[in-house]
A protein has these predicted regions:
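Glycan-processing catalytic domains of CAZymes
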Residues: 1-390
Length: 390
């Protein structure tokens, strides 16, 4: 019986070239890709396969981010609830958060973009009743004894959450923290288009650009011990900046409040009924993200390459089942098959030439370790995916 070939993509790295070639033959793979933290081997550039290159639009360029700190991406974060025991309350805004990941934004007007709320009454504390000290990292406010208070603040994303997750999970030592820059802002937008063209020019052997992903990370926050503190795959709280919010205000005709994102600390998770303001913001984000994605996809096609999107990571604003997705012009979507429902989420996408499921487990030490059983996990993942296909 003749062995078939095609519709299988395999990952590679510099030190596994013979194994990559062996698996290509064994599995009939027709595509090879690099991964976060790996490099594509020169020996495989002429392999009989399509070559995918993972492309990061918002990170892996700290020189640019550090030279343009005002265009680093930001997110809204809320402190825990604190009970006032007297008429003065101090709130340490970064308490319980990983210090290397976030940095409070004091560059922009904090009295405009931050918000202190009396959660007992639901009232906003007037801006003349509180102050922030950069030296102590604390907000000091005039309080009503035994009322509960929170501070909602903007913070720069100084360590990309996905890069941090990969570094922590793989125990990467002495790795430079990749800063997340904001492609929506003018200087970075212009630079990004030039950077994309240069990347394609420098990698002529690449057939498919695997955008991972585009501009805004889903909500992913780590605690002070580098553990996942809050995760929402659909969260928009890391898609904000005064630049973006001022554009939004011009479109909708009303002032933006931090609470539209914070939502009493629920961050508008998928179990909440969204407010009109939050829905307005999501619609605005999808439209604005779609414009720049289309620009990047057009450049990719102009240079003779295919454009593939990873379903996840910085995917906010590119949700495949919304109207704007059809305007992006993507060739393909790839996603991680966590279970049957995520497989169907990927396979049912319209408006692309093909979809691709990345089967688990990751080649990470949480599975690939002494006593681990990656075969068991792989088999379970495959059986679950097959059930969804059938």
């Amino acid at each position: 019986m003749e062995k078939s070939k095609g519709l299988v993509t395999i990952p590679t790295d510099l030190d596994v070239v013979p194994q990559t070639l062996e698996l290509m033959k064994l599995w009939g793979a027709d595509a090879i890709r690099d991964c976060d933290g790996t490099d594509f081997p020169t020996e495989l550039k002429d392999a009989d396969a399509e070559i995918y290159s993972t492309y990061y639009t918002t990170r892996k360029d700290n020189a640019w981010a550090e030279a343009n700190p005002e265009e680093i991406q930001q997110m809204y974060v809320m402190t825990p609830f604190y009970t006032a025991e007297s008429e003065t309350l101090e709130v340490e805004v970064m308490k319980g958060l990983y210090p290397d990941m976030l940095k409070p934004n004091t560059r922009d007007d904090i009295k405009r973009w931050w918000e202190v709320i009396d959660r007992t009454t639901g009232e906003v504390v007037p801006t003349d009743k509180w102050d922030y000290s950069e030296e102590t990292g604390k907000v000091t406010l005039a309080a009503v004894p035994f009322h509960e208070y929170t501070v909602s603040f903007l913070a720069y994303i100084m360590w990309d959450p996905v890069h941090m997750y990969n570094a922590v999970t793989n125990d990467w030592k002495d790795v430079e923290h990749q800063i997340t820059f904001d492609v929506r802002q003018p200087k970075t937008h212009e630079y990004t288009m030039k950077r994309l063209r240069k990347f394609i020019e420098d990698h002529p052997y690449v057939n498919v650009l695997r955008f991972t992903t585009f501009f805004h990370q889903f909500t992913l926050i780590f605690d002070e011990l580098a553990r996942e503190k809050y995760v929402d795959w659909y969260g928009y709280s890391a898609s904000v900046s005064p630049y973006i919010l001022e554009q939004f205000e011009k479109e909708v005709g009303y002032k933006f409040r931090a609470e539209y994102i914070i939502d009493q600390g629920y961050y508008n998770n998928q179990y909440r009924i969204p407010s009109k303001e939050y829905q307005d913001f999501q619609a605005f984000q999808r439209r604005e993200v779609a414009k720049i994605v289309k620009e990047m996809v057009d450049i990719t096609h102009e240079c003779g390459k295919k454009a593939m999107m990873f379903l996840g990571d910085h995917w906010i604003g590119t949700e495949p089942f919304m109207e704007e997705f059809k305007t992006l012009g993507l060739d393909a979507v790839v996603g991680s098959v966590g279970n049957g429902s995520t497989l169907r989420l990927i396979s049912d996408i319209d408006g692309v030439k093909y979809t691709e499921g990345r089967l688990l487990p990751y080649f990470f030490p949480d599975v690939f370790h002494e006593g681990g059983d990656p075969v068991k996990e792989a088999r379970y993942n495959w059986v679950t995916a097959r059930r969804a296909i059938l």
